[in-house]
Regions:
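Extracytosolic ligand-binding ectodomains
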Residues: 2-6, 14, 24-408
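C-terminal motif of bacterial Sec signal peptides marking the signal peptidase cleavage site
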Residues: 19-22
Length: 408
C-alpha cells in the first residue's frame, strides 16, 4: 500500500511538528492520561564533538518539522513537544540518553540520532523498550545486521550503494576512457567507510587499481601525511569517505601539494552550504552522493523548501531533509494507526504498519526491507559553474557530468 497525502495537513504537516521543550518527568507521559495533551518525542543528537556539524543540521530539520506541524493542527490533533539531548558524539552517552528519554522522561516516541556510530547503540535501547526507531543518518551495513526489527532508515539508500549511479556512469565509458588508479581515504566510521568502499568495490571490479587505502580516526585534523601519500600516488581518482571538517581539511591539504585528480568524490561535506567557503571556493567538479535536493519534484518537497527557507534564510540541505523525512515517516504511521504512546501494543502497530506500507516523503517514496534498509538510490551531485547540481542519473540531471575535474 502506498500512502500519499496531498492536502496541506498531510504527511508534510505531520512531519514538522516539534517544539523544543521539556518532556514529562515520570515514567509514563502525561499525554497518555487524557489523550489530548502534547505528544512528546525524545531525541539525542551530537551537538558537540566529532559529528556536531551534521548533528546541528539534523536538529534544525527536526525543529522545523516540529514548528510546521504544530502550526498546522498537530499530530492526531495534538501538539508535539521535542526533547533534544546532546550525546557529545559519544556512543555510550547516546545509549544513556535514550534510556533517560524513555525510562525517566516518559516520552511517547523517539527519533534517531546522526551517524551509524550513534544509531546502533541508540536503536538497541529503543528495541529493548519495544519502541519504533526511525533514524535519519545510520546508513552503514552494520546497522541492518544487528537484528533490529524496529528500525527504519529515512533516506533513499544505504551507504554501500550511495555511489551506484556514478559507478554505472564510469562503467559505461569506453575502457580507454575510464580512470586507471584510485586513492581512498575514509574516516574510521561505518557510514563514511561504507560510502567510500562501496565505490571502491565497483571500481576494482572494472579494473581500476587501488593505489592508496587509508583509514583515519574521527578526530584527525592534520591530513598532511595522508595527502602526501595520495599526491605521490598521482591517482586518477580520489574518494573521501568523509563527514564534514575532515573533508575540508583533506582537500586543503591536497591542494597545498598541488595534487590534481581527474575525479574527486567526497561524502556528506560537499552538500553542506558552508562547504564552498570552507575550502576557498575551489569546488568545480567535486562530486558527492546525496539523498536529497531542494529541486526534487516529490510531493510536499516544494512546500518544505519554501517553509524551511522562509524560517531559516537558507534552503534545506540533506541533513535537514533527512530529519524532516524521519518526522514524515513516523507521522504517517501514527496517523494511520491512530496512536502515539509508549505502550508496547501501540509501538508494535506503528512498526508493523511501516513494514507493509510505502510513504511519500521529501526525499521520494520510501519502503523498507525486513531489516530497515530503504529500497531506493542516491542522486549524484557535482559542482558545475560554482553551484552544486544533480548530474546523475541522467533523467534527473540538472547539468552534464564533468568527467575530468578542472584544477583546484
Amino acid at each position: 500500500m502506498k500512502v500519499t497525502m496531498h492536502h496541506r495537513l498531510g504527511v508534510l504537516a505531520l512531519a514538522s511538528c516539534l517544539t523544543l521543550t521539556g518532556c514529562m518527568s515520570s515514567g509514563s507521559s502525561s499525554s497518555d492520561d487524557d489523550g489530548d495533551g502534547p505528544i512528546t518525542i525524545g531525541i539525542s543528537l551530537p551537538l558537540t564533538g566529532d559529528f556536531s556539524e551534521p548533528g546541528k543540521g539534523v536538529q534544525r530539520g527536526y525543529e522545523a518539522w516540529a514548528d510546521y506541524v504544530n502550526e498546522n493542527g498537530g499530530l492526531l490533533g495534538r501538539d508535539v513537544e521535542l526533547k533534544i539531548l546532546d550525546d557529545q558524539s559519544n556512543a555510550d552517552r547516546v545509549a544513556s540518553d535514550y534510556e533517560k528519554l524513555i525510562n525517566q522522561d516518559g516520552v511517547d516516541l523517539v527519533f534517531g540520532p546522526f551517524s551509524t556510530r550513534l544509531v546502533v547503540p541508540a536503536a538497541q535501547v529503543a528495541k529493548d523498550y519495544g519502541f519504533l526507531f526511525v533514524e535519519p543518518a545510520g546508513a552503514a551495513e552494520e546497522v541492518f545486521t544487528q537484528g533490529f526489527d524496529n528500525l527504519f532508515y529515512a533516506a533513499p539508500a544505504v551507504a554501500d550503494d550511495h555511489y551506484n549511479y556514478l559507478a554505472d556512469a564510469i562503467e559505461a565509458l569506453p575502457e580507454a576512457d575510464r580512470p586507471k588508479t584510485a586513492a581512498y581515504a575514509a574516516m574510521d566510521d561505518p557510514f563514511a567507510m561504507g560510502t567510500a568502499y562501496g565505490l571502491k568495490t565497483r571500481l576494482e571490479e572494472m579494473g581500476v587499481k587501488t593505489v592508496v587505502d587509508e583509514v583515519y580516526p574521527p578526530n584527525t585534523t592534520d591530513f598532511g601525511s595522508i595527502a602526501a601519500k595520495i599526491a605521490d600516488s598521482k591517482a586518477d581518482v580520489i574518494v573521501g569517505g568523509t563527514q564534514y571538517q575532515d573533508a575540508v581539511n583533506m582537500i586543503v591539504a591536497l591542494r597545498q601539494l598541488n595534487y590534481q585528480p581527474k575525479m574527486a568524490a567526497f561524502s556528506t561535506a560537499p552538500t553542506n552550504a558552508e562547504f564552498p567557503e570552507a575550502i576557498g571556493k575551489e569546488t568545480e567538479g567535486i562530486l558527492s552522493p546525496t539523498g536529497y535536493t531542494p529541486e526534487a519534484d516529490y510531493p510536499t518537497n516544494a512546500e518544505f523548501v519554501e517553509y524551511y527557507t522562509e524560517k531559516s534564510g537558507t534552503p534545506p540541505a540533506e541533513d535537514e531533509a533527512n530529519a524532516w523525512t524521519t518526522g514524515q515517516v513516523v507521522a504517517a504511521a501514527v496517523e494511520a494507526v491512530g496512536c502515539a504512546d509508549p505502550d508496547p501494543e501501540c509501538q508494535q502497530q506503528l512498526i508493523d504498519w511501516l513494514r507493509e506500507n510505502e510513504v511519500d516523503t521529501v526525499v521520494g517514496p520510501l519502503s523498507w526491507d525486513a531489516e530497515g534498509r530503504p529500497q531506493g538510490a542516491h542522486l549524484i551531485q557535482q559542482y558545475v559553474d560554482g553551484k552544486i547540481r544533480i548530474v546523475l542519473p541522467q533523467e534527473a540531471a540538472e547539468a552534464d557530468l564533468i568527467l575530468e575535474k578542472p584544477p583546484w
